[in-house]
């Protein structure tokens, strides 16, 4: 598997210091739907619905219930300023959001306070979480393409799942199509994202991600591509996993 060799991390950590600095600069703009985080705001309803539906199937909940995730302990790794944490909390989940950027966590706490939501935000890394903690759901959304060692990162994520828990991972495939659309198109032509947001050699193919998850005794239950329609100006689920995709995996009992 191709690994990025230019990234820098503290010993024992999968966090890339350059990636933290990159996203820390955007902390003040996370909640602006028309700002530099606009692409995340556009895709967020789709991500939320996919996670909610997968969780309701797994834990036999009524997806129509306003409290459908009630009582479930959810860990959102690389939560940024809480774009996913807040709607998950509104669905009843006990949400723990972690991010290594102090400015991101500060922005998340401020927005949650204004929204009167009790979310446990922590400025920390996945390696620093108490190894005795366990979660019903672990989320790694648009994170694995920013870490130093994907295998080590996912091993730690899997270790925090409760028996038969649920993990959802979203990331970018590594091929010429993803380079053309996710980097050249999104960062240079359309300018949806600041230049340098992504490094193509850190993208992860579905086969690579599958192997990482299977190596950690996780069973993949579903996967889907995510595509953008410029005519409808919205994201939809698709069988096309060439660029953006999501994977759901379950821990073995």
Swiss-Prot record:
- Function noted in UniProt: O-methyltransferase that catalyzes the 2 O-methylation steps in the ubiquinone biosynthetic pathway.
Species this chain originates from? Bradyrhizobium diazoefficiens (strain JCM 10833 / BCRC 13528 / IAM 13628 / NBRC 14792 / USDA 110)
Q: What is this protein called?
A: Ubiquinone biosynthesis O-methyltransferase
The text of the family note is: Belongs to the methyltransferase superfamily. UbiG/COQ3 family.
What reaction is this protein's catalytic activity?
a 3-demethylubiquinol + S-adenosyl-L-methionine = a ubiquinol + S-adenosyl-L-homocysteine + H(+); a 3-(all-trans-polyprenyl)benzene-1,2-diol + S-adenosyl-L-methionine = a 2-methoxy-6-(all-trans-polyprenyl)phenol + S-adenosyl-L-homocysteine + H(+)
The record's Pfam families line, in alphabetical order, gives:
Methyltransf_23 (PF13489)
Any Gene Ontology biological process: methylation
List its EC numbers.
Answer: 2.1.1.222, 2.1.1.64
Q: Where does S-adenosyl-L-methionine bind?
A: 47, 78, 99, 141
What domain of life is recorded for the organism?
A: Bacteria
Recite the UniProt keywords alphabetically: Methyltransferase, S-adenosyl-L-methionine, Transferase, Ubiquinone biosynthesis
Question: Which pathway does the record list?
Answer: Cofactor biosynthesis; ubiquinone biosynthesis
Q: Any idea which GO molecular function terms this record carries?
A: 2-polyprenyl-6-hydroxyphenol methylase activity; 3-demethylubiquinol 3-O-methyltransferase activity; methyltransferase activity; polyprenyldihydroxybenzoate methyltransferase activity
């Amino acid at each position: 598997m191709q690994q990025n060799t230019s990234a820098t991390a503290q010993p024992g950590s999968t966090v890339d210091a350059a990636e933290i600095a990159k996203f820390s600069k955007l902390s003040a703009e996370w909640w602006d739907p028309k700002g530099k985080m606009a692409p995340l705001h556009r895709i967020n309803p789709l991500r939320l619905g996919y996670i909610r539906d997968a969780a309701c199937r797994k834990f036999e909940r009524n997806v129509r219930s306003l409290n459908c995730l009630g009582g479930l302990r959810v860990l959102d790794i690389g939560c940024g300023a809480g774009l996913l944490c807040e709607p998950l909390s509104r669905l009843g989940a006990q949400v723990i959001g972690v991010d290594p950027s102090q400015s991101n966590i500060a922005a998340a706490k401020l927005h949650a306070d204004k929204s009167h939501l009790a979310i446990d935000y922590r400025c920390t890394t996945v390696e620093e979480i108490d190894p005795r903690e366990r979660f019903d759901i672990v989320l790694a959304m648009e994170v694995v393409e920013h870490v130093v060692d994907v295998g080590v990162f996912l091993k730690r994520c899997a270790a925090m799942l409760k028996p038969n828990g649920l993990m959802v991972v979203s990331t970018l495939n590594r091929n010429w199509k993803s380079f053309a659309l996710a980097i050249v198109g999104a960062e240079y032509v359309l300018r949806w994202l600041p230049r340098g947001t992504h490094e193509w050699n850190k993208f992860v193919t579905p086969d690579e991600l599958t192997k990482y998850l299977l190596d950690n005794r996780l069973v993949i239950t579903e996967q889907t591509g995510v595509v953008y329609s410029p005519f409808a100006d919205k994201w939809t689920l698709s069988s096309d996993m060439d660029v953006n995709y999501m994977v759901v995996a379950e821990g073995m009992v």
